[in-house]
Amino acid sequence: MPEKNTQRIIGIDPGYAITGYGIIDKCGNKFSVVDYGVIETKPKTDFPVRLLAINEKIKFLLDQFKPDYMSIEELFMGKNHTTVIGTAQARGAVLVEAARAGIEVFEFTPGQVKLAITGYGVAEKKQVQLMTKSILGLKEIPKPDDAADALALAICLANTGVNFAGKAVSGYQYGRYGYSRRNEFG
């Protein structure tokens, strides 16, 4: 169980084939890795079954590790609309469980994550991975890339999105810090 002033954050890099997750604790200026990995779904499996697998694994992770906050990559439109739609549905499978668990969710663009991790909003993926490794005191860059991205998302929120009173940081949040969505259902 984390210390009293520790924030536990789960970062999610959503995808319908591979969803990365990374769970960290932040106490003061110190970070520790709790767990990280990926949720993989089988390509030939019916799509609703793939979404259910993502949903069930997220539920398991939230129940087991009890994070205070979730940081998830904001959806952006690329050239492949089929991939965007699938990723959006995978995000939905994740967000439903966050809402069910009462976890506050913060969304960040890739540029916001890069800025928070490296200080440079258009950093290369390798730079972000090296800084993630350094910040978390790991011996190796986390693998696979989806897990490394999820850890970077968690660090981004820990460094920019929430103060120790557990409140969203005030001020201009969307442009630099992401934003939170509060559970409107109770």
Named regions from a protein language model:
Residues 1-186:
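Phosphate- and other anionic-substrate recognition elements at nucleic-acid/protein interfaces
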